[in-house]
């Protein structure tokens, strides 16, 4: 059994907001295990939580995105975090809802991943938002442990690549996306449920990887 009921896994670069994000999470979730998974190029001297640092992946060609960054960073963090239910989120966004874990417990079946509606649609196959995920450790490990690295040979957004891998390659489900999205994902409101505040939308800092 994990030592913690709840955990928060922050994955990405050390952003301008990260120190304040961790401070808020410690205040809102004092019993949670908080882990930062970042790169060995990042200065973590002022970060007050458990930390794991990984080597940056080589850029893919001719197309490049953050898919492999997420695969490496999240898997490293999942090995470090010691919790039953995990909120996987970015290092450049606040999730302000103090009752986010209660929301999960009350609404999301344990075999699904709770995600925000922004960036999620039935109209674009396998587009399931990767802004954050909330699920049991078992389900998150299923999602992230079984992904082949993106080779850059074709253009595809990270969230589509990741969700398609989970649904089609791992779960072996080839039914139409608009018929099965809700089988694997529980969609909640970005603004009112997760209460996300995103640095990318509020500053000119480079997109966090």
Where are these predicted regions, by residue range?
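N-proximal low-complexity "stem/linker" segments adjacent to membrane-targeting elements
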Residues: 1-16
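Short loop->beta transition adjacent to catalytic acidic/histidine clusters or analogous donor-positioning motifs
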Residues: 4-6, 26-36, 49
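Soluble or luminal CAZymes and related metallo-dependent hydrolases
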Residues: 13-17, 65-76, 154-161
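Short, well-formed alpha-helical segments that are part of the catalytic scaffolds
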Residues: 15-28
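Active-site-proximal specificity loops/subdomain of glycosyltransferases
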Residues: 37-80
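Short aromatic/hydrophobic "clamp" motif used to bind/position activated sugar donors
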Residues: 86
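Acidic donor-binding/catalytic loop of UDP-sugar-dependent glycosyltransferases
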Residues: 91-105
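Catalytic core and acceptor-binding pocket of nucleotide-sugar-dependent glycosyltransferases
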Residues: 95-98, 113-209
